[in-house]
Amino acid sequence: MCIRDRTTDEIKVISVDEVTITTLKKLSPKAIIISPGPGRPSDYPVLSTILSHYDQLIPILGVCLGFQSIVEYYGGRVIHSPKPIHGHTTILRHTNEGIFEGLPQDFNVMRYHSLMVDSGCIPNNLKVTAINDENVIMAVQHQQLSIYGVQYHPESILSEYGHEQLRLFLNEAGVQYAC
């Protein structure tokens, strides 16, 4: 999936090693997607800085590591998964809101992770919006802000409705996205 081919808005990819608030301010983003990566959220303190600066200003979507960063930023906990999940699909059930609005139930998504969100430690300002058949949290959204996180990879060809989820997210920012 290439977002650049589906919108006329400018898409800028910035490495976590190069991103700063100063850089982002110069770009005046309409939305931010915090992408997957190796390690754990604490390995990338700049992600908390970005959330602190932008969470009340523009929509933010966290994917995998980005999802885990969002959960930790708002007070949740990320733990080791009982077993690493790399290159496996799972069926998820969702609450039909936010980036799931209007999508069918029980669709497949692709997972690549060895960390997961602790379901016993979800902060009150986040709402669980999707789980899989093992009750692993697959998505959250903020209760008041346009902040979303998904544990899986909507950009994967094996994730169903990934384009639709990106469209729902980007439309909140006023970005037109064609599925």
Please place each PLM-identified region on the residue numbering.
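Histidine-centered divalent metal-coordination motifs
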Residues: C64, H113, H153
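Residues that recognize and position ribonucleotide moieties
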Residues: T90, N108-M110, Y148-V150
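Short gly/ser/thr-rich secondary-structure transition/capping motifs
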Residues: I11-E18, P41, T90-R93, Y112-H113, ...
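C-terminal and late-domain segments of enzyme folds
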Residues: K127-I131, N135-Q141, S146-C179
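Hydrophobic anchor at the start of a short beta-strand
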Residues: E10-I11, I60, I147
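Catalytic beta-strand/loop cores that center a nucleophilic Ser/Cys/Thr
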Residues: G98-Q144
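N-terminal beta1-alpha1 cap of cysteine-dependent amidohydrolase-like domains
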Residues: M1-Q56, E160-C179
